[in-house]
């Protein structure tokens, strides 16, 4: 497959699945191979660079699952048993004396000779301190055996796993202070367009504030990327060339505002001088135009300029591309079916992603689905996928992708 195969003007629009497949193939051809060792405290969101193998059994010794009494089942002959010791978590017990029981607390190691634990609710303490057991017991009852969770030498996390709170907690439970992770993806973010003004500055005639820059920089940081924020590119070819010349150390150049063939497209002209670009016309709404290519060997993705289009194309296409380059295997966001609480009468030829919110067991859509309305995404908690040629009505099943799946 050519690096930047373009969709000819006369050809059908590229399905979103095909665009994603191409991007993932390109990502796999240019993996980020550099790794580094980081402390668990700084590993949130990073990608594991090698399999994590257990260096010990977990738990490392049999322990009690309950607050209660540890005993030898053979000693339970219907008579109360004296308490020979008290065992707390974090303390080594003495072997259990024959004909006795041990007061034990949750997580405390089992004493040698004991083979079961009775919870304290099923016992009665007599005036002389002996304990009467009120119910029958079975071998190993309420005992967590050594290695119940993990055995030494077992793979517990696979290479390419994104590290979240649960994975970091698991690594800590195995005694790891540091983990080997893939280097952060370095992404340069460029904005183009005479109409863009940075927040805090006065707006001129026909100008708007640059929301896409903040959207993407924040999103990339949440994905664990190292962001090189280049701001708004000037409408000057020489200055644009100079800006691009300093981006040789990044893994991706990400632009918004589109890269065209127009005479005012200084970014496109500068990129084509030392690279290759192609416009993909996608069967997706919002977000039909997507540019992919490379500049001096650095991949380039150009997202459409309308905010909702930027959100959809970054979330569904650019995000998985970046994760795959860092070695993440499963880049598919969770989705589930939910009943539509809306009527959609516009059967289109493109896959539509409506901004919606689940309320009362149904998904409702924002009143204005224009690609320029970012407020629709702030109101929503997910994207409603409307497949080509379909017109969902209230009660129909539609596919829903939570925004939380895309943003993190």
Protein language model features and the residues they cover:
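N-terminal intrinsically disordered, low-complexity, charge/repeat-rich segments that act as generic
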Residues: 1-24, 204, 216-223, 252, ...
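Phosphate-binding glycine-rich loops and their immediate beta-loop-alpha structural context
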Residues: 142-255
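Flexible glycine/proline-rich
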Residues: 17-20, 34-41, 50, 131, ...
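N-terminal small/polar loop signature for handling phosphorylated ligands or for N-terminal nucleophile
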Residues: 85, 89-98, 102-103, 117, ...
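Solvent-exposed alpha-helices and their adjacent loops that cap or buttress functional pockets
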Residues: 62-64, 73-76, 93-97, 110-112, ...
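Short glycine-rich anion-binding loops that position phosphate/pyrophosphate groups of nucleotides
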Residues: 107-108, 194-195, 258-261, 305
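Phosphate-interaction motifs
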Residues: 2-177, 337
């Amino acid at each position: 497959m050519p690096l930047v195969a373009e969709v000819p003007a006369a050809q059908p629009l590229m399905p979103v699945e095909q665009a994603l497949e191409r991007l993932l193939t390109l990502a796999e051809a240019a993996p980020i191979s550099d790794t580094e060792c980081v402390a668990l405290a700084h590993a949130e969101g990073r990608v594991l660079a090698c399999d994590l193998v257990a260096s010990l059994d977990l738990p490392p010794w049999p322990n009690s699952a309950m607050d209660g009494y540890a005993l030898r089942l053979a000693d339970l002959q219907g008579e109360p048993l004296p308490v020979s010791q008290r065992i707390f978590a974090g303390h080594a017990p003495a072997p259990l004396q024959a004909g006795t029981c041990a007061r034990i607390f949750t997580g405390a190691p089992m004493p040698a000779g004991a083979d079961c634990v009775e919870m304290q609710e099923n016992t009665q303490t007599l005036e002389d301190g002996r304990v009467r057991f009120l119910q029958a017991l079975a071998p190993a009852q309420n005992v967590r055996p050594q290695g119940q969770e993990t055995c030494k030498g077992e793979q517990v996390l696979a290479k390419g796993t994104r590290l979240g709170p649960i994975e970091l907690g698991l690594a800590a439970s195995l005694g790891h202070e540091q983990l080997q992770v893939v280097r952060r993806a370095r992404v340069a973010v460029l904005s183009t367009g005479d109409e863009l003004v940075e927040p805090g500055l006065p707006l001129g005639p026909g100008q708007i504030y640059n929301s896409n820059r903040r959207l993407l920089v924040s999103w990339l940081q949440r994905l664990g990327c190292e962001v090189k924020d280049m701001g708004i590119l000037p409408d000057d070819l020489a200055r644009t060339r100079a800006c691009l010349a300093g981006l040789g150390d990044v893994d991706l150049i990400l632009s918004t505002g589109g890269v065209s063939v127009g005479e005012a497209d200084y970014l496109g002209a500068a990129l084509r001088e030392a690279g290759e670009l192609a416009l993909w016309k996608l069967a997706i709404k919002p977000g039909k135009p997507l540019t992919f290519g490379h500049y001096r060997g650095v991949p380039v993705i150009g997202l459409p300029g309308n905010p909702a289009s930027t959100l959809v194309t970054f979330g569904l296409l650019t995000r998985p591309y970046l994760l795959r380059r860092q070695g993440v295997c499963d880049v598919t966001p969770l989705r589930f079916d939910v009943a539509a609480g809306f009527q959609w009468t516009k059967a289109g030829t493109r896959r539509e992603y409506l901004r919606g919110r689940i309320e009362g067991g149904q998904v409702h859509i924002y009143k204005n689905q224009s690609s320029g309305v970012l407020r629709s995404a702030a109101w929503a908690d997910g994207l409603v996928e409307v497949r080509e040629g379909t017109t969902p009505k209230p009660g129909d099943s539609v596919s829903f992708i939570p925004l939380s799946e895309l943003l993190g």
